[in-house]
Amino acid sequence: MKNIVYFFLVLMLVSCSNKEVLLPQVDRTIVATVEDHSPIYMFFETKEKDTLVDLNRKNSISSTNWIFNIDKRLPLKLVIPEVIKMQAKKSGSMHNNAESQNYFSYSDSIHKKLAFVPFTKVVYKLEKPKTGVTIYFSKNRILVDSVEFNKEKLEEYIENLTIEDLYKCNFCFDKNDSYGNFVKNYVFATTLEVKRTQTDTYIF
C-alpha cells in the first residue's frame, strides 16, 4: 500500500498553492537526484475551449538549479515559449550561478520514483532547421528526413554515424504534440546524443 501511495505522489506533484501537476512517465532515469534547487511549475488550465499555461516561478532563485515541473497535458507549443523566457531570465540575472543547471522532472515508471533530465545548454528554436539531417519526433512517429524509423533502427543509425555526421543531425519535435510525449521522446533522444555537443533543438 505504501508503494502504491508513493507512486501516486510521484505521478502527481502538488505545489505550495495546492495546484496539481500531472507528470510525464518515462521508463528510465537520466538523473536521480538534484540538490540545491528551486521549483518552477507550469499548470494545466482551461478557459472555455482554450488551454492555458499557468506559470508559477515565485520560489525561483537564480543561483540554484531549476526544476521545471510541467503538466504532461499541456501542448508543447505553449510550454516551450515559457521555457525560453525562463532560460533567458535565469541567464540574465546578476545572481546566476554558471554551475547551476535546468531540469525537466518526470516519473520513472519502472522504478516508481521522481527523475530528471537536464536541458541547461539546449537552445530551443521555433522553426525548421535549414541544413543537415532532420530527426523529427511527432507523437508516436520518428521521421529521419521524412523516412519513418522505429527506435531500434534510429539507435542503430546514430551509432553508425561519425562525430562529424552526428553534428549535422537536428533533433526536432512536433509543436502540436503534448508535453508528456515530448519528454518521453526527449529522454530517448538524450540517450542517443552521448557523442554530440550540439545544443540546438527545433520545435515546429
Please report, for each region that a protein language model flagged, where it lies by residue.
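Sec-dependent signal peptide recognition
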Residues: 2-7
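Compositionally biased, low-structure terminal segments
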Residues: 8-9, 138
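C-terminal motif of bacterial Sec signal peptides marking the signal peptidase cleavage site
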Residues: 12-15
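Long, low-hydrophobicity, acidic/polar, solvent-exposed interaction domains
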Residues: 17-204
